[in-house]
């Protein structure tokens, strides 16, 4: 899902 992908990206951003 787009939302899930967003969270994944946020995690990688850390």
Swiss-Prot record:
Biological-process GO terms, alphabetical: photosynthesis
Specify the protein's topology with respect to the membrane: Peripheral membrane protein
Sorted UniProt keywords:
Chloroplast, Membrane, Photosynthesis, Photosystem I, Plastid, Thylakoid
Q: Cellular location of this protein?
A: Plastid, Chloroplast thylakoid membrane
A GO term from the CC aspect: chloroplast thylakoid membrane
Superkingdom to which the source organism belongs: Eukaryota
Keyword Zinc applies: no
| Coiled coil (residue ranges) | none
Q: What does this protein do?
A: May function in mediating the binding of the antenna complexes to the PSI reaction center and core antenna.
| Family per similarity comment | Belongs to the psaN family.
This one is known as Photosystem I reaction center subunit N
Q: Whose protein is this, by species? A: Pisum sativum
Print the organism lineage: Eukaryota, Viridiplantae, Streptophyta, Embryophyta, Tracheophyta
Question: Which gene is the coding source of this polypeptide chain?
Answer: PSAN
């Amino acid at each position: 899902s787009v939302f899930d992908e967003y969270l994944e990206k946020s995690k990688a951003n850390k």
